[in-house]
């Protein structure tokens, strides 16, 4: 998703007559469904709320004796990408902020001093959190973060897509 525009695609199923796309709004706790006929009709576009988590389920179906017979669903959680911003920074602390995402269970915050490796979970935050204060930063000036929204669904934790951001620590020289 991007700015509320949801673009879905999936692999075609060889013996399918079509697909059912079910989109569950995790904030409103309501679902909507649409049937797409045709084996190769494996893309769907729609507008959704930008700061809301969704559970998307795609089922292939086949007509048997005048009834749709569905496959097992394929679930994925999606949301608008989070943008992280530096609210305040000093030589040893940094406060990172993001826009609230509705319909999730919480956030995992990971940090590293390298963009490619060494990420460790720094914090687990509640669903209402919109910022985190990071202490004991290194002197390199670069700290890389990613904030991963998650949702508990049927007893299992599912994580959402995320981006890695580089934040700079502000230094004061006397």
Placement of each model-derived feature along the sequence:
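Short S/T/G- and acidic-enriched coil/turn segments that sit immediately N-terminal to beta-strands
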Residues: 39-44, 128-133
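Conserved hydrophobic/aromatic "anchor" residues
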Residues: 10, 19, 54-56, 61, ...
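Residue-level signal for short segments within beta-strands and strand-turn junctions
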Residues: 12, 23-27, 60-64, 111-115, ...
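Pro/Thr/Ser/Gly-rich low-complexity, intrinsically disordered linker/stalk tracts
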Residues: 1-15, 67-103, 139, 155-174
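Extracellular low-complexity, O-glycosylation-prone stalks/linkers
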Residues: 13-34, 101-123, 129
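Hydrophobic residues at beta-strand termini and immediately following loops
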Residues: 36, 125, 134, 167
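Beta-strand-rich modules
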Residues: 45-68, 134-155
